Curated annotation (Swiss-Prot):
Membrane topology annotation: Multi-pass membrane protein
Any one Gene Ontology molecular-function term assigned to this protein's record: NADH:ubiquinone reductase (non-electrogenic) activity
Organism expressing this protein natively: Cronobacter sakazakii (strain ATCC BAA-894)
Physiological role: NDH-1 shuttles electrons from NADH, via FMN and iron-sulfur (Fe-S) centers, to quinones in the respiratory chain. The immediate electron acceptor for the enzyme in this species is believed to be ubiquinone. Couples the redox reaction to proton translocation (for every two electrons transferred, four hydrogen ions are translocated across the cytoplasmic membrane), and thus conserves the redox energy in a proton gradient.
Protein name: NADH-quinone oxidoreductase subunit A
Record-linked InterPro entries: NAD(P)H_OxRDtase_bac/plastid (IPR023043), NADH_UbQ/plastoQ_OxRdtase_su3 (IPR000440), NDAH_ubi_oxred_su3_sf (IPR038430)
Subunit and interaction comment: NDH-1 is composed of 13 different subunits. Subunits NuoA, H, J, K, L, M, N constitute the membrane sector of the complex.
EC number: 7.1.1.-
């Protein structure tokens, strides 16, 4: 006796369906429980920030330098690349020399990207002088070195 296609699908995926129903139910239960059990502030100062008894001065918004976001993006990018290298390292015997060559090319591309980031100054935290000023300073230093030799 053969089962119909829909019965086979249900037989194979019933556990996932139950998991999905329980997960959604648990989320709803926590939201409803927090709504019933949570405290309610119905005062005039409900939406003002708590400053430990001190009157707040100025705005609560902070301006962060874009360098923080760049470092975070570089971290994520290089972290994902490390994940790829870890996956490669676990299967190094199966992929053989071809996999090794591909990983070496991948690492060289990463190094080229890192060199590019250093060259454009994306990793410099100090206030930078203009490129023209740096070049003039380097040229002046090399000229004085030539004259002293």
């Amino acid at each position: 006796m053969s089962m119909s296609t829909s019965t086979e699908v249900i037989a194979h995926h019933w556990a996932f369906g139950i998991f999905l129903i329980v997960a959604i139910g648990l989320c709803c239960l926590m939201l409803v429980g927090a709504w019933f059990l949570g405290g309610r502030a119905r005062a005039r100062y409900k939406n003002t920030p708590f400053e430990s008894g001190i009157d707040s001065v100025g705005t609560a918004r902070l301006r962060l330098s874009a360098k923080f976001y760049l470092v975070a993006m570089f971290f994520v990018i290089f972290d994902v690349e490390a994940l790829y290298l870890f996956a490669w390292s676990t299967s190094v015997r199966e992929v053989g020399w071809l996999g090794f060559i591909e990983a070496a090319i991948f690492i060289l591309v990463l190094l080229a990207g890192l060199v590019y980031l250093v060259r454009i100054g994306a990793l410099e935290w100090t206030p930078s002088r203009s490129r023209r000023e740096r070049l003039n300073t380097e040229e002046a230093g090399s000229l004085t070195n030539r004259h002293t030799q």
